[in-house]
Amino acid sequence: MSLKRPAKDQPNTFEFNSSSLDAANAIIAKYPEGKQQSAVMALLYIVQRQNNNWIPLAAMKYIAKFLNMPYIKVYEVATFYSMYNLSPVGKYFVQVCTTTPCMIRGANKLVEACKEKISEKEAELSNDKSCSWMEVECLGACVNAPMMQINDD
């Protein structure tokens, strides 16, 4: 696993579009008064869907203001969970599980194939910008090891 770092090239601003804003407000409305910050994970997911499957720093700051919470708390959540992408990903985003059961059953061969066919380094776009890959923690299907996921499938 590699350390998750935000992309070097970042947009200066972010704002929810109308459908994302409606979705965010609907989620926040489900939380009791004073507990709306608990919606941070759901709002990060909404941002990622709106922003071509990655979350820029400006969006994390936007969520922090939206939920009236410190930016660092949003950043901590976004960098902790592997489901949040902090840099642009390709139209085809390959995630390879490299935890013990998958490594024992050949995940290293999947990683090598990704390096050869997509990009030498994980989290980098392919030459045609259509694909990217990264190592992830358990995808919850150890019985099928080695396991990989493309986009949400």
Where are these regions (language model features)?
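Signature of N-terminal electron-transfer/Fe-S-associated modules in redox systems
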Residues: 1-153
